[in-house]
From Swiss-Prot:
Name listed for the protein in its UniProt record: Conotoxin Cal22b
Keyword set includes Phosphoprotein: no
Subcellular location(s) of the protein: Secreted
Post-translational modification: Contains 4 disulfide bonds.
């Protein structure tokens, strides 16, 4: 899964967030994007699509 639209600043780049938004905009149900830093310690930003009300 991928975490929240409250972007975790040092880890999620604007580009990643924008890409996620693009990916999710075509999704009929989960058309909102959530991004968050992976707490496992990986420097990656984790993004996924969620229902808009879950943001």
């Amino acid at each position: 899964g991928r975490p929240s639209a409250r972007y975790d600043a040092p880890y999620c780049s604007q580009e990643e967030v924008r890409e996620c938004d693009d990916d999710c905009s075509g999704n009929p149900v989960r058309d909102a994007c959530q991004c968050a830093y992976d707490p496992a310690g990986s420097p990656a930003c984790d993004c996924y699509c969620v229902e808009p009300w879950r943001r």
